UniProtKB/Swiss-Prot annotation:
The gene is atpB. GO terms for molecular function: ATP binding; ATP hydrolysis activity; proton-transporting ATP synthase activity, rotational mechanism. The keyword Nucleotide-binding applies. Its EC number is 7.1.2.2. F-type ATPases have 2 components, CF(1) - the catalytic core - and CF(0) - the membrane proton channel. CF(1) has five subunits: alpha(3), beta(3), gamma(1), delta(1), epsilon(1). CF(0) has four main subunits: a(1), b(1), b'(1) and c(9-12). This is ATP synthase subunit beta, chloroplastic. It is a peripheral membrane protein. PANTHER family: ATP SYNTHASE (PTHR15184), ATP SYNTHASE SUBUNIT BETA, MITOCHONDRIAL (PTHR15184:SF71). It is an enzyme of class 7 (translocase). One of its GO terms (cellular component) is mitochondrion. ATP binds at residues 172-179. It is found in: Plastid, Chloroplast thylakoid membrane. Pfam families: ATP-synt_ab, ATP-synt_ab_N, ATP-synt_VA_C. The keyword Membrane applies.
């Protein structure tokens, strides 16, 4: 389906034309509204409740129609708090689904689920808006060519490459560098692909959302002086929002991303943090709508809801949306219906390891746990595939030997195993990399490493050509030439001390 943004939001003209209903029942964030016979709104239409509460405060609540109940009643889910609403209040049917601003005007700004700016930087140009509900692109529009999405991050490109227009699950706890990795990807896609990014904070902590915004301003991803030069749009539906907002904020972010893909014909990066909270919000709403709970108390429509979001994230002949989704795994149970349903849609998984972060190896991507469907010789080429497999074998052997080393020491290993350990430690350090967005904290200039350079570097380490170099020469460098130059500097420094 082609993207057809409207040139103005869903406006309702004169009072006579307004389709008016009245609130009949309020159950938390769910409202039942009675409309005149023959004037029922459609499913997904936006309804607006305007008026004053008992204290005289202005109320403006937007809801979305979810069910037609019969007897001229509809059931709708509120997108903001329902405090102060009373039975009998007037409800206006806007006659269209929720629409949000799209295009260049959204860059550098923070929006809520309704597409309203919440960053106190003034109004946003709303001449071009688009409804948040659309069908996924038709088969004939899809780009079926399998191609690698180069990120410039060595560990990702070599061992768990991303697919252009694919979906990646990002697994990581607090403090292992998830935010920095997200910001680096936003920075690299802007520089290498000329693309933009959209960040959807679904059920985020308000503090995390604020931290991300501040760090993006500090690192230049959001340009404060010239906001139009920014490379990212942010959409937040925070933890304190009602479930309706958390359930729909992912679609708001996706709609903004689709415009950049279909109209501007760009490669777009879409971040969703956290996809589990999208499911959780749907589960809360489902019970209030009177649906029978399914396995583990989740909504019976779990697969459908997930599919309607995920199937819109794809490559078309115009451009691509590559999505990186943080996945929370409840109680570390991968068989839980929420993560299990998400896994069915993912092309790659990037696992962040607390052990690597503790060693100071950043990005702390676990090279053995991270996987990708793209790592096949037919897609990445024989040379890349062989190198990646040898790197994994070397690191796996090192992992197996670690217990022996801890008890008996390196000297008790065979000559071959000692060599494997030495190369594995070099590989582990060479998988680290200085980031552009961390430059302001570390003082080290960031490095973007092309895929060919990455493969060449690891081939040289595996071949044994660099066995004589000290392992610290490989730590936090870009390509392999920088590692050899660093080794010479270390040697020179050592000679000077003597």
């Amino acid at each position: 389906m082609r993207f057809n943004p409207t040139t103005s939001g869903p406006a309702v003209s004169t009072l006579d034309e307004k389709n008016l209903g009245r609130i009949a029942q309020i159950i938390g964030p769910v409202l039942d509204v009675v409309f005149p016979p023959g004037k029922m709104p459609n499913i997904y239409n936006a309804l607006v409740v305007k008026g004053r509460d008992t204290v005289g405060q202005q109320i403006n609540v937007t809801c979305e129609v979810q069910q037609l109940l019969g007897n001229n009643r509809v059931r709708a889910v509120a997108m903001s708090a329902t405090d102060g609403l009373t039975r009998g209040m007037e409800v206006i049917d806007t006659g269209a689904p929720l629409s949000v601003p799209v295009g260049g005007a959204t860059l550098g700004r923070i929006f809520n689920v309704l597409g309203e700016p919440v960053d106190n930087l003034g109004p946003v140009d709303t001449r071009t808006t688009s409804p948040i509900h659309r069908s996924a692109p038709a088969f004939i529009q899809l780009d079926t060519k399998l191609s690698i999405f180069e990120t410039g991050i060595k560990v990702v490109d070599l061992l768990a490459p991303y697919r252009r227009g694919g979906k990646i699950g990002l697994f990581g706890g607090a403090g292992v560098g998830k935010t920095v990795l997200i910001m680096e990807l936003i920075n690299n896609i802007a520089k290498a692909h000329g693309g933009v990014s959209v960040f959807g904070g679904v059920g985020e902590r308000t503090r995390e959302g604020n931290d991300l915004y501040m760090e993006m301003k500090e690192s230049g991803v959001i340009n404060e002086k010239n906001i139009a030069e920014s490379k990212v749009a942010l959409v937040y539906g925070q933890m304190n929002e009602p479930p309706g907002a958390r359930m729909r904020v992912g679609l708001t972010a996706l709609t903004m991303a689709e415009y950049f893909r279909d109209v501007n014909e760009q490669d777009v990066l879409l971040f969703i943090d956290n996809i589990f909270r999208f499911v959780q919000a749907g589960s809360e709403v489902s019970a209030l709508l009177g649906r029978m709970p399914s396995a583990v108390g989740y909504q019976p429509t779990l697969s459908t809801e997930m599919g309607s979001l995920q199937e819109r994230i794809t490559s078309t002949k115009e451009g691509s949306i590559t999505s990186i989704q943080a996945v929370y795994v409840p109680a570390d149970d991968l068989t839980d219906p929420a993560p299990a349903t998400t896994f069915a849609h993912l092309d790659a998984t990037t696992v962040l390891s607390r052990g690597l972060a503790a060693k100071g190896i950043y990005p702390a991507v676990d090279p053995l746990d991270s996987t990708s469907t793209m790592l096949q010789p037919g897609i990445v080429g024989e040379e890349h595939y062989e190198t990646a497999q040898k790197v994994k074998q070397t690191l796996q052997r090192y992992k197996e030997l670690q217990d022996i080393i801890a008890i008996l020491g390196l000297d008790e290993l065979s000559e071959e195993d000692r060599l494997t350990v030495a190369r594995a430690r070099k590989i582990e350090r060479f998988l680290s990399q200085p980031f552009f967005v961390a430059e302001v904290f570390t003082g080290s200039p960031g490095k973007y490493v092309g895929l060919a350079e990455t493969v060449r570097g690891f081939q040289l380490i595996l071949s044994g050509e660099l066995d004589s170099l000290p392992e610290q020469a490989f730590y936090l460098v870009g390509n392999i030439d920088e590692a050899t130059a660093k080794a010479m500097n270390l040697e020179r420094g050592g000679n000077l001390k003597k």
